[in-house]
From Swiss-Prot:
The gene is srb7. Residues 36-120 are annotated as: Disordered. Keywords: Activator, Coiled coil, Nucleus, Transcription, Transcription regulation. Belongs to the Mediator complex subunit 21 family. This is Mediator of RNA polymerase II transcription subunit 21. SUPFAM superfamilies: Mediator hinge subcomplex-like.
């Protein structure tokens, strides 16, 4: 099993991957509908009235009264250009946004999910992010010395060093005792082997 720091790094990498996947899903499968602010929340910047061409008047909010200067009759135009200008104005005014505005969209993009499916997957992605974040918080909470000061950690390190030296000394004593017992066992086996084979040789000699 990996140590806590390795697990923490793995969880952070997984969290970054989940963030990337979540943003990718939200960017790909939303329905591209415009955001509609609640009616009780005012806009940060009020809409401005349409500014006439070549006007020097400052912009005003859409609901403000129109200044007297802008109400004056526009300058006379050349009759030769009047019809063309009128035709242009009518043509521009007749253009309205509709389904044809999205005709240039990329046909390779997947179709957006239904609102119900999109909301369900949003909740699922959010739940996965919360679970991963809770795992990270738990791993951080069980790190050794997370609630200790620097002096306390140094003191604990010195205590562990002393315990490690003591355990090393005990290990060396056990190793020496093991070697002594091994030599004793070898001597016993040698004596037994010598006794058995020595008696057999005597029996064969006097048989």
């Amino acid at each position: 099993m990996a140590d806590i720091l390795t697990q923490l790094q793995t969880c952070l990498d997984q969290l970054a991957t989940q963030f990337y996947a979540t943003i990718g899903y939200l960017s790909t499968y939303h329905d591209n509908s415009p955001a509609i602010p609640p009616p009780d929340v005012p806009d940060a910047a009020p809409a401005l009235a349409k500014i006439p061409k070549n006007s020097t008047a400052p912009p005003v909010p859409a609901g403000a009264p129109v200044p007297a200067l802008s109400q004056a009759s526009p300058p006379a135009q050349n009759p030769a250009h009047g019809a063309a200008g009128a035709g242009t104005s009518v043509g521009e005014g007749a253009q309205t946004p509709g389904p044809a505005a999205g005709a240039g969209a990329d046909p390779n993009l997947p179709a957006p999910d239904s609102p119900r499916t999109f909301a369900s997957r949003q909740r699922e992605l959010a739940r996965d992010l919360i679970i991963k974040e809770q795992q990270i918080e738990y791993l951080i909470s069980v790190l050794p010395g997370i609630d200790s000061s620097e002096a306390e950690q140094e003191k604990r390190i010195r205590e562990l060093e002393g315990e490690l030296r003591q355990v090393e000394e005990e290990r060396e004593l056990k190793m020496r005792e093991l070697k002594r017992l091994r030599r004793t066992l070898e001597n016993v086996l040698t004596a037994v082997e010598t006794g058995l084979y020595g008696d057999r040789e005597l029996l064969e000699k006097y048989a």
